[in-house]
């Protein structure tokens, strides 16, 4: 299938003036970034934002992702099959304070989508993911069969100096049927409809990211 990287919406993010930003990091003017591209996002179901956060915030996420303890990811049925999904994960919670700051920013993005699209998002969740060399994730959708609780998916990447020879791209079939092929380079946020089919190509080096979902269901305690 022909890659359609050039059709992806690549946005060079203009950060809010530093003097007007709160001391807490990960603050982005989502409305300013997306308003004039919203119709295209609705048509394609895919949005790509580059240089999203301040460099120091990205460094903090990279550091936290390197010190946490990962566990083998499983499929929806709780089964571990590395031939299908080869990443190790760590769900973000209060023990990941930098990740929680990231999630706060994602909830601001969710609030934007609620206002602009009446998306009905009520909460978000995320986990760090590490793919060792030689592994990927086969074609799938983020909503298990028969469910639609995940509304919008987002993946934030933490990999410096990523090269085309490193593999590990995310492939997304957008709403027009075209395949988006996107490198997992640091400070890139890929946003897409949670019902779109996507996969992670085999990576040839360690690949770090934060997988994120904006959901319309209530949290189950």
Feature map (PLM): residue ranges:
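N-terminal amphipathic/basic-hydrophobic helices that include classical n-h-c signal peptides
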Residues: 1-15
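Non-heme Fe(II)/2-oxoglutarate
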Residues: 16-116
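N-terminal low-complexity, intrinsically disordered patches enriched in charged
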Residues: 11-13, 54, 196
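Extended interaction regions within the primary functional domain
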Residues: 9, 61-64, 121
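Generic secretory/membrane-interface signal
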Residues: 3-6, 77, 134
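Catalytic core of non-heme Fe(II) oxygenases with the double-stranded beta-helix
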Residues: 92-202, 206-210, 214-221
């Amino acid at each position: 299938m022909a890659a359609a990287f050039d059709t992806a919406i690549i946005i060079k993010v203009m950060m809010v003036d530093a003097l007007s930003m709160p001391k807490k990091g990960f603050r982005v003017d989502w409305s300013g970034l997306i308003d004039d591209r919203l119709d295209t996002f609705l048509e394609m179901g895919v949005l790509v934002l580059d240089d999203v956060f301040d460099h120091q915030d990205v460094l903090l996420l990279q550091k936290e992702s390197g010190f946490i303890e990962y566990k083998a990811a499983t499929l929806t049925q709780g089964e571990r099959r590395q031939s299908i999904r080869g990443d190790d994960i760590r769900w973000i919670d209060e023990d990941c304070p930098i990740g929680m700051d990231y999630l706060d920013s994602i909830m601001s993005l969710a609030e934007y989508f609620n206002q602009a699209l009446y998306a009905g998002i009520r909460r978000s969740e995320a986990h760090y993911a590490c793919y060792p060399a030689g592994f990927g994730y086969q074609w799938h959708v983020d909503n298990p069969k028969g469910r639609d609780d995940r509304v919008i998916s987002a993946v934030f990447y933490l990999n410096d100096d990523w090269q085309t020879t490193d593999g590990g791209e995310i492939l997304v079939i957008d709403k027009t049927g075209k395949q988006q092929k996107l490198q997992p380079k640091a400070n890139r946020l890929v946003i897409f409809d949670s019902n779109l089919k996507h996969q992670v190509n085999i990576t040839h080096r360690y690949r770090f990211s934060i997988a994120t979902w904006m959901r319309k269901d209530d949290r189950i305690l």
